[in-house]
């Protein structure tokens, strides 16, 4: 059986990338972990080229958590989104998803990046508008850290293929921007 390759991009302020790489490796995958260097314009250009090469070799892209660029300016995952809106990186990600049937996964800040990029829910990188689904500040206007219960209502995702329908899982949740906001037609 072929081993999938997982690309894990590292940005200033992200974390869990090495723990995630170890988890994928324990599950039988190969991993590529690359740091996005942004000290000079040349570093940025080189990083874009390195990321494109890594995406081209991968079947999965996994966006790690943390606080990319300190979640500034004005909210989380903007550094991720800006970098991946580069034309070369956008093209590489879209080929991964559309031509090679690749997968994307985001944890914490990485999930926020998937939403800000449009990969969730549209399946493509696109600009956000006023009607785009997003994650925003919690209604209590502060960080929340607690255990939450999540019920599996569909296992059509490869990430949930082994989950039992109807099963409830207790998971830790910790976030300052965890409130999902979308037009009514997106909500069920």
For every predicted segment, state its role.
Residues 1-107, 111-122, 134-144, 151, ...:
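N-terminal beta1-alpha1 cap of cysteine-dependent amidohydrolase-like domains
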Residues 119-188:
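Pocket-forming structural segment of enzyme catalytic cores
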């Amino acid at each position: 059986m072929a081993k999938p390759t997982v690309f894990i991009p590292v940005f200033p302020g992200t974390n869990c990338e090495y723990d995630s790489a170890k988890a994928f490796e324990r599950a039988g995958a190969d991993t590529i972990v690359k740091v996005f260097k942004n000290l000079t314009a040349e570093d940025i250009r080189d990083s874009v080229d390195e990321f494109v090469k890594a995406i081209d070799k991968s079947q999965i892209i996994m966006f790690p958590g943390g606080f990319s660029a300190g979640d500034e300016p004005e909210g989380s995952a903007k550094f991720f989104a800006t970098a991946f809106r580069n034309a070369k990186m956008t093209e590489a990600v879209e080929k991964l998803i559309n031509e090679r049937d690749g997968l994307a996964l985001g944890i914490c800040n990485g999930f926020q990046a998937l939403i800000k990029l449009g990969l969730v829910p549209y399946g493509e990188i696109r600009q956000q508008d006023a009607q785009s689904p997003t994650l925003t500040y919690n209604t209590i206007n502060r960080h929340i850290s607690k255990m939450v219960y999540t019920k599996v209502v569909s296992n059509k995702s490869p990430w949930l293929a082994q989950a039992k329908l109807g099963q409830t899982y207790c998971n830790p949740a910790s976030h300052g921007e965890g409130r999902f906001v979308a037009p009514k037609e997106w909500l069920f």
